[in-house]
Amino acid sequence: IQKMADTFTEGYRIGFELTGKDLSKKKTVNIRYCLGFERLVRAEIKSFEKLGLKPTIYRAAVNTINKRLNIKVGYYGANPNKQMDFDHRFDNALYMDGEFIERKTGALKLAYEKNKELAAVHGGPAVMEVFGEVPFEPQIKSEALTLDTKQQKLSVKYSNDAGSIVNEYIKGEERSFTIIAYPIPEIGGNFEEIFEGTVKINTLDYNKY
């Protein structure tokens, strides 16, 4: 567990080093993961503390205002009904208009301005992904909401404006990230063997390999 944690945090540190960014300026790191890896996350938190970083961990959004289609950003659990997530990915079509987007953008800007000191010392995400899930082929339902042309343009505008706001307060040239992936039991009967092999590859000496 400790070796896996150190591999993760060292990858984060090296990301800053290779891009010539000063990690010592940063105080927080955003850990994102799938539930079930808490033992590893706890070890990662301690390893990040050795780098002078404290974790920021939050649940992936489930409300229509903040979630990103059916993409999970944060910590999340197994999904018992992927079709439902797919069907409801555009539920914001119920209320999205120009006034809403303007207000949402303003609220995001205000939140970052109020917390600009914290944003300035945020280092970026450390992401633990999973693989081996049973393939999902969604069905297109006529009853599901969709964005009309105007709403699609508003959605793109918000994404662009939100990205600019984030980059203003958490400067891209000063932040980095790391990503690692592990299999989950859905991958099949030889899960343990695959998991052990993945750990072996992930923890190889990076100076040698």
Where is each model-derived feature located?
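Active-site bordering "gate/hinge" segments
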Residues: 1-209
